[in-house]
A protein has these predicted regions:
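Asp-based, Mg2+/Mn2+-dependent phosphohydrolase catalytic module
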Residues: 2-32, 39, 43-44, 48-114, ...
């Protein structure tokens, strides 16, 4: 199969993904990017809706694991506080952290998805490893570099526009 940089699915927010939506697609493990996917870069405190989503997902049959490029201790502390496994220093888009997660859970790539806000790290990493790639709208583009990166991603989002899932459909 040819490699694609297009996401498999696009959602406006991580909280639009439901356990039923993922299970219907055969997803048993959802890997999550951390910064700008779960919380903004500028805080460690999730919004109440995100906090409820994390709780609901943990109560479901879908396993969660944060796979982050961050070397910052805040990711580990957050995950410990919320009872979520995490892999830091993941080096996305390279397969290191994603493969580590696959080994940890003993699941094939076809039963896993990675949700994140960046095409050039999260989507590419998921696609390199054969996972379902879920592009999430970034929580906050608080600086010029994040805004520039998202502008560079617009052509990919345009070509994948028919993969957008509305909240009502999930």
């Amino acid at each position: 199969m040819a490699f694609s940089m297009l996401p498999s699915i696009i959602v406006d927010a991580l909280t639009d993904l439901t356990p039923d939506f993922l299970a219907e697609r055969g997803i048993e493990l959802l890997m999550l990017d951390f910064d700008n996917t779960i919380v903004p870069y500028t805080t460690d405190v999730p919004e109440p809706l995100m906090e409820q989503w994390l709780y609901d997902m943990k109560m479901s049959d879908i396993k969660l694991c944060v796979v982050s490029n961050s070397k910052n201790q805040r990711v580990r502390i957050f995950c410990k506080n919320y009872g979520i496994d995490c892999i830091t220093h993941a080096k996305k888009p390279f397969p290191k952290g994603i493969r580590e997660c696959l080994r940890k859970y003993g699941l094939p790539a076809g039963k896993c998805a990675l949700a994140g806000d960046q095409i050039f790290t999260d989507t590419m990493g998921a696609r390199f490893c054969g996972l379902t790639a879920i592009l999430v709208t970034a929580i906050d583009n608080h600086n010029i570099w994040l805004k520039a990166r998202h502008v560079a991603e617009l052509p990919f989002i345009f070509f994948a526009r028919n993969r957008r899932i509305n909240h009502e459909e999930s």
